[in-house]
Amino acid sequence: MILHAQAKHGKPGLPWLVFLHGFSGDCHEWQEVGEAFADYSRLYVYLPGHGGSAAISVDGFDDVTDLLRKTLVSYNILNFWLVGYSLGGRVAMMAACQGMPGLCGVVVEGGHPGLQNAEQRAERQRSDRQWAQRFRTEPLTAVFADWYQQPVFASLNDDQRRELVALRSNNNGATLAAMLEATSLAVQPDLRANLSARTFAFYYLCGERDSKFRALAAELAADCHVIPRAGHNAHRENPAGVIASLAQILRF
């Protein structure tokens, strides 16, 4: 079994750019950024429980990493960068720390490196279970209307929220709930030590208005790019800023 994805081919000899969307996103989420790098082959992946991969269920990050490895092999991708937002960033960090043959580097936008104590994990587990129950039982428009009121999305205006609620409500609530629980921060290990000891290139992007993730970025041994005029979802709010940072990263 492999993950559903869309492949766009560039020039031979350059590494692939493998894009991983956030929770409730889809393989189109990164395309405005990705299409600015037409020389590179690009793979836009649907994570389990989402879009073309909605029928794929996982028990945890190990399963996601295994599926991602098999997906890259199926496309004969031998050298690549992982570029992930939020949940996709956490998947990228986990996969990189577990080992991905052919990995050139990781670019994470607004991805959490992991909670640091049992109390935080227990609190997050309670919260994610409550959200998962709502995703399973309530209309998605109502759930996402509340989802985008969370503090991390404070930089969004009302029009941006309405647009995201409409877009995300095309998902399957039951499969989203299953993925939310399987990849909860409550079950993700703290990756700070692994990332400090890494053997791969690691870059972190965060919006200048995303105070929570700017603070987290400061804890990581990573080259951090702050994206102007953007909050948590920087590649949506300022794609040109993210394109500029990614171009700078790929030039090294």
Curated annotation (Swiss-Prot):
Stored InterPro entries: AB_hydrolase_1, AB_hydrolase_fold, SHCHC_synthase_MenH
GO terms of biological process kind: menaquinone biosynthetic process
GO MF assignments: 2-succinyl-6-hydroxy-2,4-cyclohexadiene-1-carboxylate synthase activity
Record-linked Pfam families: Abhydrolase_6
Pathway assigned to this chain's UniProt record: Quinol/quinone metabolism; 1,4-dihydroxy-2-naphthoate biosynthesis; 1,4-dihydroxy-2-naphthoate from chorismate: step 3/7; Quinol/quinone metabolism; menaquinone biosynthesis
Catalysed transformations (reactions): 5-enolpyruvoyl-6-hydroxy-2-succinyl-cyclohex-3-ene-1-carboxylate = (1R,6R)-6-hydroxy-2-succinyl-cyclohexa-2,4-diene-1-carboxylate + pyruvate
Source domain of life: Bacteria
EC identifiers of the protein: 4.2.99.20
Keywords: Lyase, Menaquinone biosynthesis
Cross-referenced HAMAP family: MenH
Role noted for this protein: Catalyzes a proton abstraction reaction that results in 2,5-elimination of pyruvate from 2-succinyl-5-enolpyruvyl-6-hydroxy-3-cyclohexene-1-carboxylate (SEPHCHC) and the formation of 2-succinyl-6-hydroxy-2,4-cyclohexadiene-1-carboxylate (SHCHC).
Self-association and partners: Monomer.
Sequence similarity: Belongs to the AB hydrolase superfamily. MenH family.
Protein name as annotated: 2-succinyl-6-hydroxy-2,4-cyclohexadiene-1-carboxylate synthase
Organism: Shigella sonnei (strain Ss046)
Name of the gene this protein is made from: menH
